[in-house]
């Protein structure tokens, strides 16, 4: 694959960024994220309409994450010789199909099939996002392009739940998914118009995805990714009970805190390209260290609302560096195998999200209110130490 990348770079060196293609990828990612989290705000009417409990309806989110984890691992093995342009179009079609299947679902089984289609698109698209980006812009512009994509993710995360809730009351949950299907159609046409041909890996150069873990620093990097995202979900999944019981926020106050977090995350993502240009490794070690300190501050002085609000803003600003930073690490240190590295990264993140939320919940129920914070802070500190000691970084 390294020879293939080198040959393509020599023959088709990118001198000007293709921003239209980058924004089409960003829009598609945003649509995927919005649709992934729509059931969170529409769970009650979906459950009532289908005659199931809200807990069962919630599995529509779980199945998407589960399928996405496996799709991210095996998608690049399946499509290696296929033009990536057609693969991305297929993912946009799957996004649209998923929305339509959910919209017309008259049973829980059909609902799960629709959400599984979304998982295929989500896992596959995320696995390819870093490698797609580095083939659309010159190397020096990759961090900026990645910040555009993750900026779209931040916006999607901020608007998904309130938008779904508002539209659900206005037009009904099925029409919300019909509207999402219309966004999927727009994705298809924008990608067809803007995304150039991106040849896949020749079949004679196929390599086992997991052999990448034998490279110096790669296993350490994946462990660091796991710990940082597990630390994030150990805390953020339970921000509502922590903030309402520790700091005494009401529902309205918590809403403002979450909005502040979302805005800070968007700002952090927007600024990430400037920080990563200076030092990717410093950002990947420094960000979790700041988060570890923030968790400690919240544990000790979180009963003060101004402290709790400040920590939420700092957390949003700082954590935004981590996903962009690790994607930049892949495009620089594993440029010859960016798709396969992206596959492992997405699977690790999905597993980390699940483990972090599960262990954080156990700690909250069995140890105490601040235990998710202590768990998160410990994982973030270990991440900072591991990155400093073991993660290798190539210069751009």
Swiss-Prot record:
Indicate how the chain sits in the lipid bilayer: Multi-pass membrane protein
One GO molecular-function annotation for this sequence?
antiporter activity
Could you list this entry's UniProt keywords, alphabetically sorted.
Antiport, Cell inner membrane, Cell membrane, Membrane, Transmembrane, Transmembrane helix, Transport
**Subcellular location field:** Cell inner membrane
Is Transmembrane there in the keyword field?
A: yes
Q: Which Gene3D superfamilies match?
A: MFS general substrate transporter like domains
Can you tell me which family this protein belongs to? Belongs to the major facilitator superfamily. DHA1 family. NepI (TC 2.A.1.2.26) subfamily.
Task: Please identify the protein, giving its name as recorded.
Answer: Purine ribonucleoside efflux pump NepI
The species this protein belongs to is Escherichia coli O6:H1 (strain CFT073 / ATCC 700928 / UPEC)
